[in-house]
Amino acid sequence: LPELAALDIVETRNGRAHKNNFYHTLEVLDNLCNAQRERLNGLRHSLAEATDDAEKEQLKADIERFEAHKLWLRWGTLLHDVGKPKSKRWDNAQGWTFHNHNFIGAKMVPNIFRRLKLPMDMKMKYVQKLVDLHMRPIAIADDEVTDSAVRRLVNDADDDIDDLMMLCEADITSKNRVKKARFLENFRLVREKIAVLIKNDYERELQPCIDGNEIMELFGLKPSREVGDLKA
């Protein structure tokens, strides 16, 4: 993996150095593996405690999906910063920058998978998506957590939103406790908004496509139980 080895460098200019992104990546991967272990243990405990059949089936499905994605989420984590060497620039005001490293890294994923003879199917697309989107929750958490920004994130990440959030939470390796606490709190707010949006979307799907007034007009009915039956 020369793309990963290329991260093992620290460059200094005008007394300002960037972090070693190779060791950062290993730390993020370690954080993610610990988080996965905790999540899986939590799901298994919930399954053991569940008494409702529907809840059990849902938990079994959650565990099955989690197990299926576990390895590929680790690949996404391992490759999340591989675009940094190609995107590294020096700015006299900001110091070292890595703008668009997520986009550049995502473009590198297919070649890496092909060379390593890894699957070139949806697993590769999944890893590519994680690499591409991994800066989005961080950008949201670093600013005001708005509904519109979270909505765009949910639409783009789709069913992989929880995996993406796990990667981003693992990506917080700052030794500044105040900064780390702020990011984690904002990520908690992002997760809350995601849960609300998903719940609202689900409830909206359950709503009938037409209302009572439209039914009365369509069938020439007056307000009655029959209207309610048709609406149901």
PLM features: what roles do these ranges have?
Residues 1, 118-127, 222-229:
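Short, surface-exposed acidic
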Residues 3, 163-166, 226:
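Residue-level recognition of specific faces of alpha-helices
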Residues 1, 76-77, 82, 134-136, ...:
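Core structural elements
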